[in-house]
Amino acid sequence: MPVLGLDNITGRIMRAGEGRILRRLQRIAAQVNSLEEEFKALTDEELQALTPEFTRRHADGESLDDLLPEAFATMREAARRTLGMRHFDVQLMGGAALHFGNIAEMQTGEGKTLVGTLPVYLNALTGKGVHLVTVNDYLAERDAEWMGRAYRFLGLTVGVIKSQSTPAERRAQYACDITYGTNTEFGFDYLRDNMAWSQDELVQRGHHFAIVDEADSILIDEARTPLIISGPADQPTQWYGAFAKLVTRMRGVRVQEEQFVTPADKDRLAHLRTTHDYEYDPKKRTVAILDRGVEYLQDQLGIESLYESEHTSLIGHLNNALKAKEHFRKDKDYVVVDGEVLIVDEHTGRILAGRRYNEGLHQAIEAKEAEEGTEAGVTVRNENQTLATITLQNFFRLYEKLAGMTGTAMTEAAEFHQIYQLNVVPIPSNRPMIRRDDPDQIYRTEEAKYAAILADIAERHETGQPILVGTTSVEKSELLSGLLRKQGIRHEVLNAKNHQREAQIVAQAGRRGAVTVATNMAGRGTDIMLGGNPEAMALAALPEDATPEDREAVLDRVGRAAAAEHEEVKELGGLYVLGTERHESRRIDNQLRGRSGRQGDPGASRFYLSLGDDLMRLFRAQVVERVMSMANVPDDVPIENKMVTRAIASAQSQLEQQHFESRKDVLKFDEVLNRQRTLIYAERRRVLAGEDLREQVRHFMDDTIEAYIRQETGEGFPEEWDLERLWGAFRQLYPVGITIEDLEDSVGGRPDLTVDDLVAAVTEDVHDRYARREAELGADALRDLERLVVLSVLDRKWREHLYEMDYLRDGIGLRWTLGREPIVEYEREGFDMFGAMTEAIKEESVGYVFNLDATGREGEGSALDRRPTDGLHFSAPTLDTAEGVVEGRFTTAPAGEPAEHDKAPPHRPGKSRNRRRRKR
């Protein structure tokens, strides 16, 4: 009997509960339906008066679950009156599923945007704010304006966070009952709030309830890489160019586990490793330097050992240069426009404007392009240092309640449950799906595959049937576009290079005779409607200064024409979706297919594959090749073979599992940092709230004095202690009043002196000096100074700690070679480093409290003069990028000129604990 994995068991349990959940949702829909006629009879004023009534009832103790039927009936009627749209029963079910904190899987075209209004209205009654999370600014603005008509009719306020919003605008939008925005904007505002220097700078007001649209894209695909706010780092750029040049002369061997299974294969691999400089795995997207490569680099760089501590940073440059060489291809992973390397989102094909890979990877790609010289003007830009970071998993887990909507969630149900404790509820479609999904056609060569694709497109185009062709990269979309031009077939191309026309192209993709070649359609956000999208087409036809009357007239005319064309296209078979190869994820394939057959319309789909496709090359294409050879299949004849289909499904399953493991790894490591971040951010909020820090600063003094003393007196007899050096350190910390002689006299001489005597005497002295400081400045002035000091020191030390943790994370994988578990080592060392950081915060805070003047400044260039929100970059995930994170520009309100360097008072002699630890 086969043993089931945890994911399979979890999946079975969840599927077993689906029927029970759906029956509950159907009962709720029936309750709402029973109220429909009663609510239809209400006047506008009576309907609008229900919102304050519901709010009062909830404040009096009635639960949201109890209010649900009436609130849903209210929103349904409001939507009918303001939007001309009535929620279907399945939409009521979807809304209830969201309210109960689930992922609602609803097919494309089922009206997910309208579904969201139900739980949003209900949960907004608490007054705590509801966040609607979308994949881009366009959808956030569109949905806030569109659905906002119903919310405002019922007396709720609606805000939208845009990438260019100022802090003041953001604060106003978050104060609304309902706030729309992208996942990155919500996440970055959380991080920026935890870099604020006063409560007036805070923009968010908590994390009560969030509904995530396109939940699989945001919660799954983007979860492998964290959000990061970074600032300039002191990193010399010459090494990027040097290593880009060096790796061009190095030979790599392609290594994949399944290629080296037998003993003979392993012997061959061992030999290959002696004749090559490095190895790389395109499936795992990893690189590893080999002995021969180490010797070559040491010779070229003129160093004895690449692995000496002073050369550690060179290993990072080497790894990035090799990754740039082997794993990042122009016009697939990135494009070069006007001398700038721009990342292409793997799943949507969009250019991620202003975004950059982090940790030196982007610079390595720039150096590669500059070295190859194929693109003029590419230069290596400066690297950035992490100032604040959080993964999307941990950000969304901040919410008291979380829900999501998507058309494709069941394939990731186990991950949603394991990472977010969210169940996936498949909501039935309002009309049955009648799209026909034809079997894959598999060819031996890419040439034969493209010939078949062109023939299929030409035949269907001749009839007028609209065709959507899905490709996996910019490169492939432009290749196919060139072939179509040669055939004389008019078409549109939607990829990263012309994303500005995206909405217009998608709006026309369902029209008669339309041929649209697009990179992955995940998260496009605009339905492909048969006959065209009348709203989008009307918008394109109107001038900017059109009057409302003009808009209504054009919309009416375009709507009637689109309705007639809709029926015509239905007769032709609806939208035909043609996939030019399988994606790494079955979910993305399903999203492409889901563009056809919306709301019961006819449609068809088919994928064309070849043995040269990326997915087939990664996973044992030789098995498929053998099958085709045995069957004597000519190049231009496709096969439909169960074994081949299983091999493709297995390849996708392996990659999905690999990405899942990668996301779990990210979460494991971030959990360590998350515990530390929670403590630091809670401390910041306490300081910002204006809590009296007097007792805390006194504790800082006590701990610092004791640490100084125990470090100096840890060995030897009292006569051997170097008290002169200890007192020198004290004098740099605070104006010492007690002398060594006074102390010795008080105990009868040096031999009788104990550590406890030292601690008690110096602690009493520092408390006395602190009281004098308070009398000199005044209590209020000292409290303000303490608040400024603690915030400044905490922020700077946290930034340094993040740098140290990045450094630790980069090298922790080497612990495998010592037989240690990397995550355990990372947690242990990270705990030690956090302890060292907190000690340093205490030490420096005490020094600043005693050594700064009453204004909190030591002169220009002081550490306290520096504002952490000046000149920052933000870093956000692409949709499932394989390496690193990406950075982008962020502009804030001006807050003074940043200082060149942070200065701390010169406390005890010797290196800081963090630096000592790291170089030990």
Swiss-Prot record:
Q: Where is this region: Disordered?
A: 859-920
Q: Where is the composition biased (Basic residues)?
A: 906-920
What GO biological process term is on the record, naming one?
Answer: protein transport by the Sec complex
Membrane protein topology class: Peripheral membrane protein
Q: What is its EC number?
A: 7.4.2.8
Please tell me where this protein is predominantly located.
Answer: membrane
Give start-end positions of Basic and acidic residues composition bias: 859-870
Query: Where in the cell does this protein reside?
Result: Cell membrane; Cytoplasm
PROSITE patterns in the record = SECA (PS01312), SECA_MOTOR_DEAD (PS51196)
Q: Which UniProt keywords apply?
A: ATP-binding, Cell membrane, Cytoplasm, Membrane, Nucleotide-binding, Protein transport, Translocase, Translocation, Transport
GO annotations of cellular component type: cell envelope Sec protein transport complex; cytosol; plasma membrane
Q: Does the keyword Acetylation apply?
A: no
MF terms in GO: ATP binding; protein-exporting ATPase activity
Sites where the protein binds ATP: Q91, G109, E110, G111, K112, T113, D527
Which Pfam family name is an example for this entry?
SecA_PP_bind
Q: Which reaction does it catalyse?
A: ATP + H2O + cellular proteinSide 1 = ADP + phosphate + cellular proteinSide 2
Q: Which domain of life is it from?
A: Bacteria
Q: Does the keyword Protein biosynthesis apply?
A: no
The broad enzyme category this protein falls into is translocase
Q: How does it assemble?
A: Monomer and homodimer. Part of the essential Sec protein translocation apparatus which comprises SecA, SecYEG and auxiliary proteins SecDF. Other proteins may also be involved.
What does the UniProt function comment say about this protein?
Part of the Sec protein translocase complex. Interacts with the SecYEG preprotein conducting channel. Has a central role in coupling the hydrolysis of ATP to the transfer of proteins into and across the cell membrane, serving as an ATP-driven molecular motor driving the stepwise translocation of polypeptide chains across the membrane.
Q: Which family does it belong to?
A: Belongs to the SecA family.
The record's annotation in PANTHER family points to:
CHLOROPLAST PROTEIN-TRANSPORTING ATPASE, SECA INNER MEMBRANE COMPONENT OF SEC PROTEIN SECRETION SYSTEM
This one is known as Protein translocase subunit SecA 2
Q: Which organism is it from?
A: Streptomyces avermitilis (strain ATCC 31267 / DSM 46492 / JCM 5070 / NBRC 14893 / NCIMB 12804 / NRRL 8165 / MA-4680)
What is this organism's lineage? Bacteria, Bacillati, Actinomycetota, Actinomycetes, Kitasatosporales
